[in-house]
Amino acid sequence: MPNDEHLAVLRGGAAAWNAWCAENRGTADLAQAGLRGLDLRGYDLSRADLRGADLRGTNFSGANLSGARLEGANVFKAVFDDADLTGAFLYGAQFLNCAQLGATRNWQSAFRDGDLACGASIPDRPN
């Protein structure tokens, strides 16, 4: 279950969220959150726990998702244009495809399943 405080700050807009993240360097707990269709352009979601979240149609354009955990999240029709996926965990992300990955930055370093090789080597799964 997601942290209610984290959800409230997230819904307050990118400026409020990014300021909160700068002060609270821990992991944002948004696991299993219902974030369907939200506009999260430019949000700093680095290291956020989005495992199992409903992210259908969510706009992550320009967002920082480095080190974020998206395992098992539903990203059907989510937009990732110019999002940073450095070291993101994408194992089991539902409906993720190579076209979505190709629109991002640093996707080659994201930890992902073999069906998302998309012409690049897959980093070894971390312990």
List where the protein language model places each region.
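Tandem repeat scaffolds
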Residues: 5-8, 12-127
